[in-house]
Amino acid sequence: MKNLIAELLVKLAQKEEESKELVAQVEALEIVVTALLRQMAQTDQQALIQSIESALEDARPGSQVPVQDSEMLQQYVKKLLRHPRN
């Protein structure tokens, strides 16, 4: 029983570490996207944003992806593009 608990704790620690790595990757990508957007001319920036939003609309997943997940992704992308980090 103790071995089982120890194994579960090790697996939990590994999952937590993986989660931290994913958060760091997402934050790094946010910083890069924000920096790139800030370097673009306003018209180019708007054209890129519209292109990305249009591509997202065209790529809406089918019924195999929950609607809530799809909407969350779209909201996050819109937030990142329209209101980038400071």
UniProtKB/Swiss-Prot annotation:
Cellular component terms (Gene Ontology): cytoplasm
Coiled-coil residues: 1-42
Intracellular or extracellular location(s): Cytoplasm
Keyword Cytoplasm: yes
InterPro entries registered for this protein in UniProt: SigmaS_Anti-adapt_IraP
Pfam families xrefs: Anti-adapt_IraP (PF10796)
GO biological process, alphabetically ordered: cellular response to starvation
The keyword Lyase is assigned to this record: no
Swiss-Prot/TrEMBL keywords: Coiled coil, Cytoplasm, Stress response
NCBIfam families: PRK10244.1
Family in the record: Belongs to the IraP family.
HAMAP family for this protein: Anti_adapt_IraP
Free-text function comment from the UniProt entry: Inhibits RpoS proteolysis by regulating RssB activity, thereby increasing the stability of the sigma stress factor RpoS especially during phosphate starvation, but also in stationary phase and during nitrogen starvation. Its effect on RpoS stability is due to its interaction with RssB, which probably blocks the interaction of RssB with RpoS, and the consequent delivery of the RssB-RpoS complex to the ClpXP protein degradation pathway.
Full protein name: Anti-adapter protein IraP
The organism of origin for this protein: Enterobacter sp. (strain 638)
Gene: iraP
